[in-house]
Amino acid sequence: MVAGSILPIAIFKGKLYFLFGKENSMEDSSKGFSDFGGGCENKESPFETALREGGEELSGFLGDGDTIRRLIKQNGGTYKILHNDYNVHIFRMEYDENLPKYYNLNHKFLWERMNKNILNDSKLFEKIEVQWFSIDQMRIRKREFRKFYQEIVDLFIDNYSDIKNFIQSRIMKSGNKKTRSNKK
């Protein structure tokens, strides 16, 4: 099955950080961390799927598909990694160390108070938590990723220099050599 995903990446203190989400406890097929994506529906392109799934799986924290599309365009486009029929669309965003805290607290609050079947069926709580991972953390914690996704993690590790060059070139093109978080 052809699939598409988004993977936000930021630079903080000279290091790349990848934003991954962890499947909720009701996910039976493959537990663990991965990016934000899924299978193509109704003749969608992998990129259109990535935008839709990104909005759903991040519960709007980066906006809906149209907002994510604008964010990607504003930040220089995507670096694409293809693994079998799985299309990862990597893009730059500003590092926000609090994003996981706000996302995770919000989801924990709602998850504990709402009917789990309704939440699971809504597709709004596919990811129960998000975390920033450095490349070193990805190596150390690789077994915490979904089984199928561990091979994709290897591709990120193998292509780290190219990914970092892509992200840095997007910062230079935007004229923003330092993000707010990097100015500290």
Please describe what each predicted stretch is.
Residues D28-F36, N42, Y79-I81, I90, ...:
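Functional cleft and adjacent loop/helix regions within the main domain
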Residues M1-F36:
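N-terminal strand-loop-strand
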Residues V2, Y17, D85-F91, E129-Q131:
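Short beta-strand micro-motifs in enzyme catalytic cores
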Residues D35-N75, H89:
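The catalytic Nudix box helix
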